[in-house]
């Protein structure tokens, strides 16, 4: 599943080709992805793309007449191509530009989304979200306060979008390992000093992943079609049974909140 770094890499990849360009037409090859594709997106035809933003794992394509909101779901990807490039299987949405280019959305599992939001309004999918992890609003004081009295596992806690957005499964596993915190520990039992380290590692891990082009495990590709290379940097994710890179003991695996969780019983407390 594309997580925050992969979505940010997609934003960085498509923005230079799209901001300032005019939308010529939308082409929908399916009426529905995760949800019905709103016909209001057609209102954006003829509009200039003013900006492309990211909020959590959503991309927001802004015009004066509203915003197209894109979620990559489990297997979605975006590429900027020549408009006459033939559509392939699973190419479900085209956003055609007047400069002869097209933003093409491919999604084999069709669990992503294209939504629309009127000017000056906020879509329901973007409400009740915590701060972005790479901003100053996400800091150890903030999250330590949020965690007081919480009995939920710390891994599940930092993956809660109401607490902080965009800390997906891969990056939660890696950050907890680097911080030597067991993912099963109750969030309320994490000390202030440990929160300082964990916040630092979450930020650092996400930044490295963005610089590496994200993590390609199966479906994700960058806007130019290239894979992300952060998978080569993974310390514990997907490595159950392999030696811990710190102590050599076999890495463990269990499920927390239905998500695969990888850790070292010796190094993490």
Curated annotation (Swiss-Prot):
EC code(s) of this entry: 3.2.2.23, 4.2.99.18
Co-factor binding comment: Binds 1 zinc ion per subunit.
Chain positions of all zinc fingers (FPG-type): 235-269
UniProt family annotation: Belongs to the FPG family.
Catalytic residues as annotated in Swiss-Prot or TrEMBL: 2-3, 57, 259
Species this protein is from: Vibrio parahaemolyticus serotype O3:K6 (strain RIMD 2210633)
Catalytic activity: Hydrolysis of DNA containing ring-opened 7-methylguanine residues, releasing 2,6-diamino-4-hydroxy-5-(N-methyl)formamidopyrimidine; 2'-deoxyribonucleotide-(2'-deoxyribose 5'-phosphate)-2'-deoxyribonucleotide-DNA = a 3'-end 2'-deoxyribonucleotide-(2,3-dehydro-2,3-deoxyribose 5'-phosphate)-DNA + a 5'-end 5'-phospho-2'-deoxyribonucleoside-DNA + H(+)
Disulfide bonds: none
Entry's Gene Ontology molecular function annotations: 8-oxo-7,8-dihydroguanine DNA N-glycosylase activity; class I DNA-(apurinic or apyrimidinic site) endonuclease activity; damaged DNA binding; zinc ion binding
GO biological process terms, semicolon-separated: base-excision repair
This protein's encoding gene: mutM
The keyword Phosphoprotein belongs to this UniProt entry's keyword annotation: no
Subunit structure: Monomer.
Cofactor: Zn(2+)
Function (record text): Involved in base excision repair of DNA damaged by oxidation or by mutagenic agents. Acts as a DNA glycosylase that recognizes and removes damaged bases. Has a preference for oxidized purines, such as 7,8-dihydro-8-oxoguanine (8-oxoG). Has AP (apurinic/apyrimidinic) lyase activity and introduces nicks in the DNA strand. Cleaves the DNA backbone by beta-delta elimination to generate a single-strand break at the site of the removed base with both 3'- and 5'-phosphates.
Protein's UniProt keywords contain Zinc: yes
Protein name per Swiss-Prot or TrEMBL: Formamidopyrimidine-DNA glycosylase
PROSITE patterns on file: FPG_CAT, ZF_FPG_1, ZF_FPG_2
Positions that bind DNA: 90, 109, 150
Keywords: DNA damage, DNA repair, DNA-binding, Glycosidase, Hydrolase, Lyase, Metal-binding, Multifunctional enzyme, Zinc, Zinc-finger
């Amino acid at each position: 599943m594309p997580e925050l770094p992969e979505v940010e890499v997609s934003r960085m990849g498509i923005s230079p080709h799209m901001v300032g360009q005019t939308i010529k037409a939308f082409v929908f090859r399916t009426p529905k992805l995760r949800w019905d594709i709103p016909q209001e997106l057609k209102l954006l035809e003829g509009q200039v793309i003013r900006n492309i933003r990211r909020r959590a794992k959503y991309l927001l394509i802004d015009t004066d007449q509203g915003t197209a909101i894109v979620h990559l779901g489990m297997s979605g990807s975006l590429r900027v191509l020549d408009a006459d490039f033939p559509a392939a299987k699973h190419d479900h949405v085209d956003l055609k530009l007047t400069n002869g280019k097209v933003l093409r959305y491919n999604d084999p599992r069709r669990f992503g989304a294209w939504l629309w939001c009127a000017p000056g309004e906020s879509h329901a999918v973007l409400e009740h979200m915590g701060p972005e992890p790479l901003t100053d609003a996400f800091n150890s004081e903030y999250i330590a306060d949020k965690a007081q009295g919480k009995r939920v596992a710390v891994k599940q806690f930092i993956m809660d979008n109401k607490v902080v957005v965009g800390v997906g499964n891969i990056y939660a596993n890696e950050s907890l390992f680097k911080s030597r915190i067991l993912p099963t520990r109750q969030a309320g039992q994490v000390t202030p000093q440990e929160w300082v380290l964990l916040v630092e590692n979450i930020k650092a891990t996400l930044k490295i992943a963005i610089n590496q082009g994200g993590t390609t495990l199966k479906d994700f590709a960058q806007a130019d079609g290239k894979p992300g290379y952060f998978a080569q940097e993974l310390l514990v994710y997907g490595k159950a049974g392999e030696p811990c890179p710190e102590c050599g003991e076999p890495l463990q695996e269990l499920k927390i909140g239905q998500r695969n969780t990888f850790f070292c019983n010796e190094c993490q407390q």
